Amino acid sequence: MRGLGAYATVFTPRKDFTFAEGHIIFLFNAILATDITEILVQTGWVARGVLAILLLFSLISWAMIFQKWGMFGRIRRQSAQFLHIFRSTHGVTNPQALASSGSPFANVYAAGYRELQAQVGGIAPNPHPPRLKSLSAVTVSMQLASAEEVRRVEKGMAWLATTGSVAPFIGLFGTVWGIIDAFAGLGSAGAASLRAVAPGIAEALITTAAGLATAIPAVIFYNQFLQNIRDLGQRLDNFAMEVTAQVEKAFN
């Protein structure tokens, strides 16, 4: 791997720069000229521990992201298929739609279907259908099923939220430790040997970058999945109201 200096312009102090500005530019050029692999090899046990923790967070987060992405894709396909079957027939009696399992909408419909069967003893076509004992019981059963479906798809979201909020602070810990190490090296080597400071600064920047690289994808996908869950919950509630209206029309 080539050093960062191969891709960056080395800054040269102007003659009118102050002594402090010249030293800052010297440090910046030293960091750019350092190979990243060399930095990782020379990092202390604290920085390595921080990077290992961030790597673990990142791997679990990406596994969760891919799992959620596939899950929402399946939900969209299964729900579209179920709703097409359900709305292509008239009335509540729709065994074919009930058999279309896998979709959260099918599970909500199945909960209302079971409650309806328990009250009227079956929902086969009848010119004189019995009256429902409690329409609200059918509605509540579907609402409970809807809440359970939302809870099911929410699994794993807490990990993404934790990664997005904690990873930057873990990286910040490595940053603070690297700065402390850099100043310790400056104190032991003397002000004339500023190259002793560059590895500590580079170590601090590496952990900061790792923390941000871990947190940013987790936050982005957490917000996207959270919006998907909210939309799904609203659609399930609307579907429960739609089924309730059909039940009321058919049996009351």
How does the language model describe each region?
Residues 76-173, 181-193, 220-252:
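Predominantly long cytosolic amphipathic alpha-helical stalk/bundle segments
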Residues 203-218:
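Hydrophobic alpha-helical transmembrane segments of polytopic membrane proteins
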Residues 190-204:
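Hydrophobic alpha-helical transmembrane segments and adjacent short intramembrane/lumenal linkers
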Residues 43-98:
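Transmembrane alpha-helix/interfacial motif
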